[in-house]
Each structure stands twice: as C-alpha cells, then as structure tokens.
Amino acid sequence: MTAEVGWKVGGKQGEGIDSTGDIYAIALHRMGYYVFTYRHFMSLIKGGHTNYKIRISNEVVRHHGDDLHVLVAFDQTTIDHNWSELVDGSVVIYDTAAFEAHKPSERNVNLCGVPLTELAKEAGNTIMKNLVAIGVSACINQLDISEFLPVVQDKFGKKGQQVVDMNMVALKLGYDYFESHYDIYFPLPSKHEKIGEHLYASGNQAAGFGALAGGCRMLAAYPITPATEIMYWLIGQLPKHGGIVLQAEDEIAAINMA
C-alpha cells in the first residue's frame, strides 16, 4: 500500500477525458480521500492531446505531484507524452480495440491491454468506454465500485435510470475484466476519518467564489478557455447577490465595460 497514488487519463480532446477524471475524482473525494486534480488541454474544440491527473492521499495535498502510478491511455500519444512521470512498476491501461501500445523506452512499466471499447459495447454503447476505464482503475486501486453509484447517478440521472444502470454495468465489466486477467494493484491508503469535512472545488470555482466573497458584483467577459468556467459559475451566483454577468462580443469590449 502506497502513501499516495498518482492517476491520469489521457487521449484526444472530445473523448470525454474531463468527465472521466471528474467522476473518478468526485467519487474518491466522497469516499473520504484528499484529491488534487490538474487538467492539460490544447486550445482546440476537438482533437489534440488532453489529460486529467489526480493525486490521491489520505492527507492534505496542495499540488498535483510528479509521480504517476496508473495511466489510462486512449492513444499512444498519451503514453509517449506521460512516460517520464511513470514510476517503477506502474500500470498503463490501454484500449486494445483502438491501438497496440508500445514502450517509448525500456522501463519497468506494465502495459495492460483491456478491450475498453468492446466491453462498453457489451454494456450497451461504446461511448461508455470511459466508465469501463473507471472500473479498471477502481480495481487497481482496490475500491468498492458500489461507492461510485451516487456519482454516476448525479452525472447521468437526468437521462433516466436505464442510462445510470448501463454505466454501472460498464464500470463493473471493467473491474471484473482486470481482476480476472491481471494481478497488479496500487491499493489506496486508509480513508481519512473526517469524511465530508473537506471541500471539492476546481480552481476556477474557487476563483469565482473568491471574487464573490471579495465584493465583486459585476463581470464583463468573453468566453474563452480556460476562463469560461469562472464566467459560468458566476452566472449562477452573482444574480443571487444583486450582481450581473455581461457577455461581451470580444475581450476588448469586456475590458471597456469593466
């Protein structure tokens, strides 16, 4: 059992990398772990490499860390891009239906092929390969998959119970496949005793909250990555406190409004 675990998922933008990381991070947080996440993305709507890293511990963590124990790769670029972060004996999960993984250099790293797409298809839809990957990760980290149900319910509940059930099936298929084919695990440390006494928030949410608490009551902005999340958060909060959000036609107009 390690004192902390570094986990990352990567692939092309538009493959659901952020939602995969969010579901895993939120579930871990609700289980009582401290998590610090970091998202890497390119200034493109679709395509280009993106990844989502989570540092998991039962103690407070204040940065995303340097070490990586588990990497979920939806393409070879993810392996190449993050190879130097992987620790000795770490695990790389890759989709055998998408590509045949290879090591950029010879190191003690375990390449574990899992038919993520095929298992997702078995669950009902290939788009659920992300939940299969979460199930594989839960197995590697020795987590109880039933604890993911509330998060999956929150994420997909509006689409109906059938969708929730299908995603949980996908998650379990991933867990069971890895458990029956591999014997490599990175169990997480014991959970923190004070479950629920720490918050889960993104840096953008924290920035928006800080602006609101500091007295900001007007935001003029033009939506552009990565600041758009701050704008969206304040759209939902400023009107409750007598404030307003104005979307300008460009950045210069937003500056002039302010």
Describe each PLM feature range:
Residues H192-A258:
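Non-catalytic terminal/interface segments that mediate subunit docking, oligomerization
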Residues M1-G214, M218-A220:
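Active-site cofactor/cluster-binding pocket
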